[in-house]
C-alpha cells in the first residue's frame, strides 16, 4: 500500500514542470505547470501576475534545442512545443505591435509596450535618424530618472545609459540637452506616452527582422508591421506592401514567397531565401498571424492556411487569437481602477545596462573611422555571401550598402525610404530568428569586429557565451572555408527544379502503373463490353493471358492455399 502511494506521488511529481518567463523589465516569473498544460494556461497565469487585461498584443517566445526561436502556440501543449529538458525558460514579449500605441486603454499596457520598444531601440531593430534618436533617448531618460538635477546629474551623465548599439559623444550631448531644456516636469507616464507617439511615426516601428537573402544573394531583413510587409536592406526600406495587397504567403524548404496584387491588376511574387527550413517556416507562420491580426475584421474570418504544393502535403497553420479590431472593441469596455505600476527606474537592466558604456565613436577621427569601416566591410564580403551567415548591415560612417533588389517584380514605383542617417546606424542588431549552424559564432564575431558588446539577455536566450579573442581569430580563419562550402540561391533553385522534375516523373510512373493494373483486371474479368472484347481477341492479349497471367494466377493461388493450410494446422 505504501509503495503504491509513493509510486503515485512520484508519477504526479514527474508530470509537473518548472517554467521561468523573463519579463520585459528583466525580472523573472516562475511557475509550475502540468505535463498536458496548454500555452493558453501559462499565458493566462503570466497576465494575471502582471495584472494585464489588454493581453492580445503580447506573446511568449522560446528557443528550441536547435536554436530556432518560436512563438508559443496557445492551443498546444507547452511541454511538447519546447522539446527541451526542464526547467523551461521563455520570454514575454510584444507579438503584435498596436497600430497606435498611444490609444491603448490602460497605462500598464502602454508601459509594457514602452519597455519593448526601448528594447528594440537598444538591439537595433528600431532604426531612426539622429534627431529622432536623441529625442527618444531623452524621453527614456526623463521616464527613468526624472527631471534634470545639477546636483545629482554631473556632466556626461547621459553616457551612463546604453540606449543604442552604438553612440557618440555628440549624440550624448544632444540627449542631455533635450532632457535638460525640453522635458522638465514630465511624469514617467507622460514621457512614456510621448515616446510611444514618436516611435509610432518611424518607418521601422514594430519591425521584428528575419534575416534572409534575395534571389541575387544579397542580404535582406524581412519583417511584418501593423501596416504591412517590409524589406530592409542596408539602412533603407526597399519594399513596403500593405496588408490588403498581400494575397498569399507560402514557403517551400528555405524559400519564402509573397504574392502581391496591386492596382491595375498587377500581380507580383517576391521570393526570398531563409537560412534554414525551420527559420523559413517560422517566418511564414509569423506572416500568417500578422496578416490575420491586422487585416481581418473578426476572428471568425480566420481560415486554416496550407503551404502544400501539387503533389506533397505541406504545413498547415491557423491563427487562434482575436484580431486587432476585436481587441480594440474589447479594450474600450474595460472599466476598473488603473492598476499600480512598478517601474524599473534606475535598476540596471540586462537589455539596457545603466552603467555599461557602449562603443563610443568619437575617439577616432572621422576620416580614419570611415577607412577602418571600409576595410572591415571588405573583410566581411565572404561572410555576407554565405547562406549560413548572419547578414551584416553597413555602418553609418561609410557609403551605404544597398544591393540591387531583384525579384519577380520587373517594374516598381516604390520609393526607397531612408530610415537611418550617417550619425546613427545600429549595425549590431540582435536577430530574432537564429540562422543555421555556425551562425551564432559568426554573429558574435561580427559584433566583436564592430566593437559592440552582447547583452546578458542575448547570452541567455542563445545559451552561448561570447567567444574569446583567440576563438575570434580561429573563427576568422575558418570563414572563407565555410563560405566556399555553401551554395548560393541560384544553385539551390537548380536543385529544387531537378527535385520537382523527379517528383513529377515518379508520380507519372506511379499513375501509369496503377492504370495498367486496372486495365489488366478489367480485361481479365467477365465484364462484357465491346471495347474489352476487342482487346481479348487480339493475339497479343492471348499470348499475355496464357504465357504470363495464367501462370502468375496459379502461383498466387498455390501460395494462398499453403498459407491457409498452415494457419489451419496451427
From Swiss-Prot:
Q: What effect on the protein does mutating residue 354 to P have, as reported in its record?
A: In NEDEMA; uncertain significance
Q: Which residues carry this modification: Phosphoserine?
A: 375
Q: Where is this region: Disordered?
A: 344-367, 385-407
Region (Interaction with ROCK1) location: 308-353
Keyword Ribonucleoprotein attached: no
GO biological process: one example: regulation of cell migration
Give the main location.
Answer: membrane
What topology in the membrane does the UniProt record assign?
Single-pass membrane protein
**Subcellular location, record wording:** Membrane; Cell junction, Adherens junction
SUPFAM superfamilies in alphabetical order: PH domain-like, Second domain of FERM, Ubiquitin-like
List the CDD domains hit by this protein, alphabetically: FERM_B-lobe, FERM_C_FRMD3_FRMD5, FERM_F1_FRMD3
Comp. bias intervals (Polar residues) = 388-398
Q: Which disease is it linked to?
A: Neurodevelopmental disorder with eye movement abnormalities and ataxia: An autosomal dominant disorder apparent from infancy and characterized by global developmental delay, intellectual disability, speech difficulties, ataxia, seizures, and abnormalities of eye movement.
The protein's job, in short, is:
May be involved in regulation of cell migration. May regulate cell-matrix interactions via its interaction with ITGB5 and modifying ITGB5 cytoplasmic tail interactions such as with FERMT2 and TLN1. May regulate ROCK1 kinase activity possibly involved in regulation of actin stress fiber formation.
List the protein's name. Answer: FERM domain-containing protein 5
Q: Which gene encodes it?
A: FRMD5
